[in-house]
Amino acid sequence: MERRNAWKIYTADQLKELDQINSRYKVCLDEGKTERECVRLTVKEIEKKGYRNLKDIKDSLKAGDKVYAVCMGKSIAMFLIGKEPLENGMNILGAHIDSPRIDVKQNPLYENEDLAYLDTHYYGGIKKYQWVTLPLALHGVIVKTDGTVQKVNIGEKEDDPVFVVTDLLIHLAGKQMEKKASAVIEGEKLDLLIGSRPLEKEEGLDEDEKDAVKANVMKILTDYYNMEEEDFLSAELEIVPAGKARDCGLDRSMILAYGQDDRVCAFTSLFAMLDVEDVERTSCCILVDKEEIGSVGATGMHSRFFENVVAELVALTEGESDLKVRRALQNSKMLSSDVSAAYDPMYAEAFEKRSAAFFGRGLVFNKFTGARGKSGSNDANAEYLAEVRRAMNAEDVSYQFAELGKVDLGGGGTIAYIMANYGMEVIDSGVAVLSMHAPWEVTSKADVYEAYRGYKSFLRNI
């Protein structure tokens, strides 16, 4: 069952739309490098389209109404109310907006031999050696005890300083090079170099000051953000690769960017949601946090946030009813939108070609994920697979079915099984990615476009 290369069949109008979607996507990648930034960006975009915050709704909701709810600034759910009763179920697109990164600890700032560092703890599954000697940026928030929230974004503008995690020079790395890849760079060595210039006497340096470089860094932070060192205790600072999303390849057919797992699915789901109107079944797009560490916590998919919001919607459309909430969830159908591993000829030994996802061949569906004997997976029903195929065929969407890699080589999971716990039909679907979980990941522009088309077709035809 060879799948067609989508590039070969596009019309001139489709190529024009493809470029527009991918340009829009790159802007979103640049603006949304953390889960908080993604939520702020999403709220800005959906409010332009008439979406209202659910907490501000006092009257009942009717078909055509658009609402959204935010959880702690890190997850968001948006709904376009359909003509059918909510208890008949929804068509749901679900993706995650957190990505592997390095987080700053709560007591991070220290000096060692006239060099200032931020102590860190990595987040998600990373190859630690990939994060050294790269230009890095600092994003996040500092929250003071009076409730003031100060946004931080250093390293993205052309005239901003950047930061780095250093590595041992090759001339002295004999022992280091003998280590396994997992141990070449240890987690405790991923500390961020942020300064080397001591505070000067004219700037308030005490004669007996031992950590003059640290003091200078703290002075700069105080000048810019009005913060004290204690404010690190209530800060969330994330270290991400500095720089914009770029076209990749002489033919500009690909995108190289940070965080495409899973923002390529999140943003294409968002675009699809914004571009549908007048639906029969209520459409929903939910973008969540914490997937990379197990979907735990208040902002992860395991929380009751989504269920609580659906209960609010039922109350505002059909009147309060726990039974109708349960029916609305069980009768829903979902695409768990998460990325797949693209077949990489450089590492062909990791893939089984008949069950691999290929660049340029469209939206990828995974009947199941998990590891080895399908452990921990959501295994979608054949009847639902057929329904999804019909929806894709209805609008001539290019798509392919794949597994992550060879059976016993490893595995992975998504939010699919969590939503399936409600009894709804769920299948994983997303975009094939090269160098997944690396600081810079690669996607095909054709696949980005087909994901947008596929998600839109799902909302309209299921």
List the model feature ranges, each with a label.
Residues 1-462:
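N-terminal hydrophobic/helix-forming segments and targeting peptides
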